Amino acid sequence: MESQQLSNYPHISHGSACASVTSKEVHTNQDPLDVSASKIQEYDKASTKANSQQTTTPASSAVPENPHHASPQPASVPPPQNGPYPQQCMMTQNQANPSGWSFYGHPSMIPYTPYQMSPMYFPPGPQSQFPQYPSSVGTPLSTPSPESGNTFTDSSSADSDMTSTKKYVRPPPMLTSPNDFPNWVKTYIKFLQNSNLGGIIPTVNGKPVRPITDDELTFLYNTFQIFAPSQFLPTWVKDILSVDYTDIMKILSKSIEKMQSDTQEANDIVTLANLQYNGSTPADAFETKVTNIIDRLNNNGIHINNKVACQLIMRGLSGEYKFLRYTRHRHLNMTVAELFLDIHAIYEEQQGSRNSKPNYRRNPSDEKNDSRSYTNTTKPKVIARNPQKTNNSKSKTARAHNVSTSNNSPSTDNDSISKSTTEPIQLNNKHDLHLGQKLTESTVNHTNHSDDELPGHLLLDSGASRTLIRSAHHIHSASSNPDINVVDAQKRNIPINAIGDLQFHFQDNTKTSIKVLHTPNIAYDLLSLNELAAVDITACFTKNVLERSDGTVLAPIVKYGDFYWVSKKYLLPSNISVPTINNVHTSESTRKYPYPFIHRMLAHANAQTIRYSLKNNTITYFNESDVDWSSAIDYQCPDCLIGKSTKHRHIKGSRLKYQNSYEPFQYLHTDIFGPVHNLPKSAPSYFISFTDETTKFRWVYPLHDRREDSILDVFTTILAFIKNQFQASVLVIQMDRGSEYTNRTLHKFLEKNGITPCYTTTADSRAHGVAERLNRTLLDDCRTQLQCSGLPNHLWFSAIEFSTIVRNSLASPKSKKSARQHAGLAGLDISTLLPFGQPVIVNDHNPNSKIHPRGIPGYALHPSRNSYGYIIYLPSLKKTVDTTNYVILQGKESRLDQFNYDALTFDEDLNRLTASYHSFIASNEIQESNDLNIESDHDFQSDIELHPEQPRNVLSKAVSPTDSTPPSTHTEDSKRVSKTNIRAPREVDPNISESNILPSKKRSSTPQISNIESTGSGGMHKLNVPLLAPMSQSNTHESSHASKSKDFRHSDSYSENETNHTNVPISSTGGTNNKTVPQISDQETEKRIIHRSPSIDASPPENNSSHNIVPIKTPTTVSEQNTEESIIADLPLPDLPPESPTEFPDPFKELPPINSRQTNSSLGGIGDSNAYTTINSKKRSLEDNETEIKVSRDTWNTKNMRSLEPPRSKKRIHLIAAVKAVKSIKPIRTTLRYDEAITYNKDIKEKEKYIEAYHKEVNQLLKMKTWDTDKYYDRKEIDPKRVINSMFIFNRKRDGTHKARFVARGDIQHPDTYDSGMQSNTVHHYALMTSLSLALDNNYYITQLDISSAYLYADIKEELYIRPPPHLGMNDKLIRLKKSLYGLKQSGANWYETIKSYLIKQCGMEEVRGWSCVFKNSQVTICLFVDDMILFSKDLNSNKRIIAKLKMQYDTKIINLGESDDEIQYDILGLEIKYQRGKYMKLGMENSLTEKIPKLNVPLNPNGRKLGAPGQPGLYINQQELELEEDDYKMKVHEMQKLIGLASYVGYKFRFDLLYYINTLAQHILFPSKQVLDMTYELIQFIWNTRDKQLIWHKSKPVKPTNKLVVISDASYGNQPYYKSQIGNIYLLNGKVIGGKSTKASLTCTSTTEAEIHAISESVPLLNNLSYLIQELDKKPITKGLLTDSKSTISIIISNNEEKFRNRFFGTKAMRLRDEVSGNHLHVCYIETKKNIADVMTKPLPIKTFKLLTNKWIH
């Protein structure tokens, strides 16, 4: 019997199988409460007899036979004897009898004396203590109550028995706790229903069906008082009774209301957890239903957030809606409303495909009605709690009492009071509850509890010889590590943590103690009946109590599910601390392996396959029970989600169904996959797979090409392998019709070997399903393995081979066996496997020297085919080796740095699993082996030396007063393996030779200098050089040694070519700042520098005056001092507080030379001549740090798990050379096609607007006679070169209007069809800004015009034809163009010539020379941008006259006449302008940016702290090797194009303060590394945060009527790649910033002065052109000024000495600058660096400095 019952429940873990021996009951579908009267009578007699025998004759005891169970036990058994409890005396599950009135007649069950009542309530006989039913009530159970919900169909015999014998019904249990009152009142109501008093029970509306009589009220009152003692009543019940102690009806009514509310909540939760939707009902109804449920739950205090609600809704979607699970599963912030928008879209698409009726949304009233109509359309599949019984004579089982006092314990004898519209769901276990659902009657299945545990109870077990418990809270006198061997029914060891005493305090106030074992590895807490019998305690299942031999009742027994339980409330808690026992060492052999670890170990196979494999022993070494499966259902492997993402499943059963049956290895499937691009030549590009039809055994072989001889070699190999290893001959090979299979060579080979080739039918790849599915599975595994391990892509075939080994060992759910078992091979020993990419250390048996490290970091790939070793990849050697000499490298950090979830580490599990294969390095000896020299065929990476030996440089401790970390060096001899880096390094393309990776040796003779620390914290690249060495306190004299005489401070004329050194500033967290560095002249610098070439003339020492003007001879009547003041006046320069002079300490007056070699692209101002951080500079202030965003940089740090190697020396490579096989980049499309805007547009309103715009465009085309409508041409008659494709494009303008445009495909236009010399001119942005500035100063009126369909006014000269759009139905016809259609190469130039001719001839305008599209006459100025015109004039009537002339020829619209004197708002060429004539003008783009930036999909942080500056000083763009797949590269380049394109548009329009950052990042569009993208995101975030900023202009108030044009220039020396300098200029007109420029110098400058000269020379041409434009538009005199903060540059401009120019390039630049300054009457002025607003154009600045320089003109 025991073995039979154990076999029925194999899934129960340790101890649970034993627990089912004596307490498990035969499975029945009958209600335990539903007991017929006849059986109660029989039971009463048998029970009375048994009780009387037990009372009078203790020496004998009999158990009545239970007619409900087929028990092999005899009806009577001997009484218990002294000593252990006999096994045959225990009540088995089949001997458990229902209990009746005699049970409740026991004195111990009625501790309270009944209240006095009428004698009619007492039955005959003085011993009865229970009330008798009044005669008016009738015989209990004789007729069912209509409200009870149960009907009984009794046989005639049953009727006679009921009428004659039944006098009592089963009463409710005693109320023992206020928390149990809700459950107790249900049983009490059931008791009243069974007593034919159901009519007096209040209904839902609070009123009974019939009035209650006095006798019934008395009966109600007394029974309530008996079974519900006052001390256990809830407070609200006591409050009712305090008012009227007889008002039991009110208590029942309120209880029913509470139960109804709880039932509704439970039903709502169950309905929400079991939603189903497939589109069969309207989406509106489904949405209304769900939202109503969520609203009700939220109103009742059960909050359902968006994430949980969306998961529940998506889980119930099926059919065409199922794909939403996959498209939406990564949207973490998705709302229910957004999800229903997608559901509505699919539903409307379905309806649209079924009929042509338009879809519409219903009004709210309709939705409410629908919610009632469709409430139960998705009713879950359930089993009703109390179905109606059809046969009352069937055997029933009595229900035991729930004596648990726990509020969370489920009630085992309560029924639902009323039914709800939604049936309760059946749960297999309590873990199926969702959303905090309580375990109520509506969720518990009382007929199947094989897996349920009754919380707070001990399970009675007669088969267990020892008591086992999981919690340590009740163990007394515990001792650890007991030497006890305990096994379960399957003979498996149960680990025991401790042994102690379990102490009981029973109802008779006696205390008893038994021995107990502590273990967490059991399903239930087991109470051994054998140990209870040893202390004279027996279990009486007749009365369901624990009692002593003298009959003393100790505790009730509760039957729950199939087992019997005793409450833990009788246990005495102990004072032992839980960690004392829980921390006891558990044997490693018994600890369960976590499922994620096994999932990764077995090549990321699914849980079902792994369980099948373990059950069938296809995977050996451990069993299914050794794995913790608790997380298998909900576990989501991110690597699987990424690596195995797919569009749809392959069609099942697509293989030929009627093929012949073959023996193993007679029928093979084969297919070739490839090629894999962008791999080194040594790596395979293809693989060929074979699958046996019968066993499903797989083989894979690498291929480098698909040539005939390569394929033939593989076929020869596998056929020989099958013949020798399996003694089988291949008969048929199925393959596709690729040329590699259909060639003559292979065909002859197959024919020679007697093999039949079976080819798939043409264009039917599905017929080749076996091979196709295998390739897909292997590729999914490959991507997942590479994603999880981080290994380089050229190891892809190793991942394929690892997956094949594991897949051959996993059991198939259909066959229940693995391919290895089918093939007759042993199962795979998992202890011989390592996770793919597992970091290991390989022993180097032949090191370079005796002191060289003996371990080489590597990554395990797969078991070797040719030995007992393992294939391991060694990144440092660029090869794979076959070896057994390795140890596993343990790491405690997250393996998956790309995901934001908990780290997974399995070091202990891996150690246990591979214990027999672990160590090869002993503490006293190292066993050397020659295995390392065995190179396998997996050596896919050629040997490239990327780590040349570098000289070691020792850094002095005095690097910086704030540096406390000692310097470190990285060399080849000091490599260390970081435990925090689990991922493998991404390798560079081995085909890139050393010559194009390493810097050219001819470029500089500077010795190589290794890094002193990695660039892990933000990309700072520090050099291993003695920046600051300790100096003597005394001043040293000048000597011939440069190392003792050079000053660390600024030297403008310092020559790198002659000294082989480069100035490098000291790094600081606060960026660069030179406010504490005193200015020194070139002469002073020259005195401190020895062995240098002759320099230029130096200026005399400068004073501390804020403005210094250099006198230049110019024909002006104004004094030079007044000219300087007039130029400086009104400029938006920052106001600086006075500063006290800073003195240098003596030790730093003389510093040694600084040697550096810097090639990084910088956002931090490397080598900046204008900003240095001195030795006594302070840290950045809180203002500088408060808005700094911490972004990850893909440099070598703890979060970058791509490398286990030390940081390499930075190597500059060409941007394009870093990307493999890069092709053309498609332009970004922002418009819609015809099918997108109209044909398949789901938005009905938008579609209608596009249709309206389409008809408007067609009418305009016909009106303008765009083509010849008189004749249509055949396509064959026209030269294809002259045929232009055409299409409609649609877009939505910023003002909300929808526009359609018919355009020609000019991108594919033949060059012979247009004149490449024609130009399409538009107004220059500087011209527009100049015109706007002059308009503000001169109180001009500004009028904005638009010419509709401007291009169509221009005739076309060439003979061109276009194809009509496809929807017009003229596919074979052509039409000849007559007008310049939009999109043609020549259309812009044709329109420009047309409008230019009209403005000059008809409007009396003339074009300003050198400034295209700027027209003027004596009164009006016009700026033309294609079809937009901006008119400026002092008299508004002048503008109106021009407008009238334009309307005579063109369809001209007045966008804004500009006649108001108040503030007027314009939208001119993307600029949002606020203009109040004579006062101010504000230029911004807030609305445009608010609309455009969110569409870029940039991770914005709108609620976080705002950035104070667009970038951080000291950050460098690390341009190491960039290895990306082509698709990934294109996607990132496209993203960079969009982001930098928008930033450039904003920067060159008005945000000139951003131009440096934009220009630097624009140089890296083709190098989209993670660091570049992070910096770009930071820039976009800053633009978003400051989108409301505006360029502010105020009307100037000059003393004299002159215009003042000023350029402020600056340069940062050598801070760009290849030592290029960054130059910047800002142009101001009358104190208003009208433009700016930031760019990298085209030539390499050799000093800061040369960089400043280059910057000034770049600004002068545009300054002269602007001067000419201003004089043409405004006839006032003009003063031109040039401001710089380089005094040495000023001295060069004014000097007449040409002897000291260091080279020809420098001299020619300087001489040209002198000529330009003198010839153009430029006033050159000095400006302090701290006031130089052009500083923002050349380097990133600290937040405080950035704000100081920009807040006067951008705010």
Swiss-Prot record:
Bias-annotated ranges (Low complexity): 153-165, 402-418, 960-969
Protein modification: Initially, virus-like particles (VLPs) are composed of the structural unprocessed proteins Gag and Gag-Pol, and also contain the host initiator methionine tRNA (tRNA(i)-Met) which serves as a primer for minus-strand DNA synthesis, and a dimer of genomic Ty RNA. Processing of the polyproteins occurs within the particle and proceeds by an ordered pathway, called maturation. First, the protease (PR) is released by autocatalytic cleavage of the Gag-Pol polyprotein yielding capsid protein p45 and a Pol-p154 precursor protein.
InterPro entries: Aspartic_peptidase_AS, DNA/RNA_pol_sf, Integrase_cat-core, Retrotran_Ty1/copia-like, RNaseH-like_sf, RNaseH_sf, RVT_2, TYA
Biased composition (Polar residues): 1-10, 48-60, 127-152, 1005-1015, 1054-1082, 1101-1111
Record flagged with keyword Hydrolase: yes
Gene3D superfamilies: Ribonuclease H-like superfamily/Ribonuclease H
Domain RNase H Ty1/copia-type residue range list: 1610-1752
Residues reported to bind Mg(2+) 2: D1346, D1427, D1428
The name this protein goes by in its record: Transposon Ty1-OR Gag-Pol polyprotein
Species for this entry: Saccharomyces cerevisiae (strain ATCC 204508 / S288c)
The encoding gene: TY1B-OR
